[in-house]
Swiss-Prot record:
It comes from Rattus norvegicus. Glycans are attached at residue 184. Residues 1-22 form the signal peptide. This is Heat shock 70 kDa protein 13. Gene3D superfamilies: 3.30.420.40, Actin, Chain A, domain 4. Keywords: ATP-binding, Endoplasmic reticulum, Glycoprotein, Microsome, Nucleotide-binding, Signal. Pfam families: HSP70. GO terms for biological process: chaperone cofactor-dependent protein refolding; protein refolding.
Amino acid sequence: MAGEMTILGSAVLTLLLAGYLAQQYLPLPTPKVIGIDLGTTYCSVGVFFPGTGKVKVIPDENGHISIPSMVSFTDGDVYVGYESLELADSNPQNTIYDAKRFIGKIFTPEELEAEIGRYPFKVLHKNGMAEFSVTSNETIIVSPEYVGSRLLLKLKEMAEKYLGMPVANAVISVPAEFDLQQRNSTIQAANLAGLKILRVINEPTAAAMAYGLHKVDVFYVLVIDLGGGTLDVSLLNKQGGMFLTRAMSGNNKLGGQDFNQRLLQYLYKEIYQTYGFLPSRKEEIHRLRQAVEMVKLNLTLHQSAQVSVLLTVEENDSQKPQNADSKLPEDQLTPGDGHHVNRVFRPGLSDSTSGKSQVLFETEVSRKLFNTLNEDLFQKILVPIQQVLKEGLLDKTEIDEVVLVGGSTRIPRIRQVIQEFFGKDPNTSVDPDLAVVTGVAIQAGIDGGSWPLQVSALEIPNKHLQKTNFN
């Protein structure tokens, strides 16, 4: 008997050793399941690599690790991501964005009417659902699911090109507030793109996984997700490897686009006060918007950033009206004492036959100015934070980890506002732009049976949970 046990033990050790050597020296298998973050403003795709335990967020053909959640329809084709972004100002009525706000959601006619005024494209109400009307060779009606499917198809193609093999299975994230119909509509969009969804995971849970919180001893986790257009705050209660969403709040009309708009309005006023005209050419407005976005990004790292945009002045715009200052609102557009904006208007080429000339508008924007223009918006971030603490019956001192998600949480002043409120630094160990897609990719690796095996995050459904929105 003892001899048999010895032989059995030796066999087990041999198998374990063989498995270890196989992991060390055999070629690593290619990931078979992708993880997708289908965001409101940007979306991305990632994979978990067996053996190394690393996550790779897959870039597009130009090296972008996320693509704008935009789809444009023209007479000849459908453009997705950055190609769509380039058409946004020249073809606004046929460029659909924010489709995630509409997917699977039931609207009353009054609710939808309140939403559609924000968009240049046409939104229709059909049996309680939203649809989009676009005109290419003819007028066609497209659903939010179809728009989502075009984005998911682009992400699928990016993954297939990177991995060098077809991809059929995915894990996808959705907001914790999504009901069953919204989740099923998201799955339907993936099916249209040729993807089978193995699991739907809540975005806050995915972010917590990216930070490794499913493997450490924490109890209460607050996830602050501030992206391009929405703010979502979620209170997670972690019990072992399980996550329960205790409370949700947010503002679905607050994000990086709003911060950009404040700076854009300010620059418009600077141009108007000097020249008495506002940029009206679509390509110049597009360049100005791009410049504002670049300034915002640069100000996360530097104390000042430069704006330089070439503008066209029509002959009848060359004289500044005497009452120019009264044409634009003053609130939030004028910096306080101590702000200096270095404006340079350089005359360019003039065409006497067409009555047009060009000027180079240059200005230096300080981080202090940017913060002043947006301070009231930054403070609004605290409102849903206070609400989830109230609904969760917790004091802010009881929160174990404050996790930041979304590109707008890079803004130094926003991090400072959060730090001052909680009295401690938020967890910034993960790239906030990639937190959700990283967590989804980890879960995709788990569902695909990748090794080294990670601890899976189990979500406890909370059917009574309602999100409080502050708009």
